[in-house]
A protein has these predicted regions:
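An N-terminal alpha-helical hairpin/helix-loop-helix interaction module that forms a charged
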Residues: 1-78, 94-178
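Contiguous, well-ordered alpha-helical segments that form the cores/surfaces of helical PPI scaffolds
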Residues: 84-92, 106
Length: 178
């Protein structure tokens, strides 16, 4: 499948290949990856645990892939970081999750004088960054919900081909990004 078509630059950009590695690993071990996604998308389980298990499982699969063939030696990363995982969660549950990009988080936090975290993709710091980011986004969404004029402006820009964004999560992303 075409990563640009499915997620634009969310999963593919310069030197960032989570979509390509996801397809590669899913082709190599489809049941492993299917199981990892089922656990990632299981809302009954805590998000930090799901995040950690998904990353660890992708790393184990990547290692098996790399060892399976000398031609696979360049597969040094699975690229399944906070950004990629936020895309998967947001695509599945768009009314609950937000698209995460570290630079957007840092720049917006700095603009507001909030403390932002160093970029990280592993362990408690990554989980803490995701929780902090989601809290910041929820604060913005709360303000958007109190502003009917902003809501109307946002809805007016969407046509029938657009996701209707009933919870204003994409509008929140626009506010953070721009």
């Amino acid at each position: 499948r075409d990563g640009k078509k499915d997620g634009g630059n969310l999963l593919t950009s310069s030197m960032y290949y989570p979509y390509r590695m996801l397809v590669t690993l899913s082709t190599f071990e489809p049941e492993t990856m299917r199981s990892l996604f089922r656990r990632l998308l299981d809302e009954q389980r805590p998000l930090p645990l799901r995040y950690e298990e998904f990353r660890d499982g992708c790393e184990e699969c990547r290692e098996r892939f790399q060892k399976s063939d000398p031609d696979h030696q360049k597969a040094n990363s699975h690229y399944q970081d906070l950004r990629a995982i936020s895309v998967y969660l947001t695509f599945e549950y768009p009314e609950k999750y937000f698209l995460y990009k570290y630079q957007m988080f840092k720049q917006f936090s700095d603009l507001l004088g909030l403390s932002s975290m160093r970029q990280t993709t592993k362990g408690e710091k990554a989980e803490s960054a995701l929780i902090s980011y989601n809290k910041m986004c929820e604060t913005i969404v709360d303000a958007v919900r109190k502003d009917p004029e902003l809501q109307a402006m946002s809805k007016a820009r969407l046509d029938e081909n657009c996701y209707p964004d009933p919870e204003f999560h994409l509008l929140t992303m626009d506010i953070i990004y721009f």
